[in-house]
UniProtKB/Swiss-Prot annotation:
PANTHER family: TRANSLATION MACHINERY-ASSOCIATED PROTEIN 16. GO terms for molecular function: preribosome binding. Belongs to the TMA16 family. Residues 1-38, 168-197 are annotated as: Disordered. It holds the Pfam family Tma16. Keywords: Nucleus, Ribosome biogenesis. This is Translation machinery-associated protein 16.
């Protein structure tokens, strides 16, 4: 019977001593790759959450409006905060069926309630971040956005809180905001000039 030819492609790996420099190097590389993957996944998750929020706002904009007032922006945020109401009602209907002993979709219901609570706290606190629909130029850029995440930095964001809805004199607030926006735009331009050089 003929002998099988030795397989040259199969090479046995050398056993590495656990305390050697090579083992430490491989461990460092593995940790570095894990850290890169974790950061990449966290960034992708953050971008997808922001993308979903922006997509919701873009689909609920009034096409005839050239710019929104802060009061109208607050009304839009209120409808954004109630976006899960129909899903919560469906979950409640499923759970109210007679004979069911366990709650169905309990984890989804918990996630939705936590999200709504967190967003409501942001809105009543220092403000929830939405696309800048108060400024007509930024609103036009936002409407032209094609949901590409690479173009996300082009969209200007603004924090709006419930105190904007409760402000007594809208004219004073708007006049002050125009001056503030001019200062912010000049600061943005100076920062971009510094970054280019």
């Amino acid at each position: 019977m003929p002998k099988a030819p030795p397989n040259k492609n199969k090479q046995e790996k050398k056993v590495i001593h656990p305390y050697s420099r090579k083992a430490a190097q491989l461990t460092r590389e593995a940790h570095k790759q894990d850290r890169k993957d974790r950061l990449k996944n966290e960034k992708a998750l953050r971008l997808s959450i922001i993308g979903e929020k922006l997509q919701w706002f873009q689909s609920h904009l009034n096409p005839e409006k050239e710019e929104y007032t802060k009061k109208e922006a607050c009304e839009l945020i209120e409808s954004y905060l109630h976006r899960f109401d129909s899903e919560l009602e469906q979950i409640e209907l499923h759970n109210n069926i007679k004979g069911r002993q366990t709650r169905r979709h309990g984890s989804r219901e918990t996630v939705i309630k936590q999200t709504i609570e967190r967003e409501r706290q942001l809105y009543s606190g220092y403000g929830i971040e939405i696309p800048d629909i108060v400024n007509s130029k930024n609103l036009k850029v936002f409407r032209d956005w094609d949901l590409d995440m690479k173009k996300l930095p082009n969209i200007k964001m603004r924090k709006i809180s419930i105190s904007d809805l409760l402000s007594k004199s809208g004219k004073e607030v708007q006049g002050g905001n125009e001056e503030t926006e001019d200062k912010l735009e000049s600061n943005d331009e100076s920062l971009s000039d510094v970054q280019e050089s």
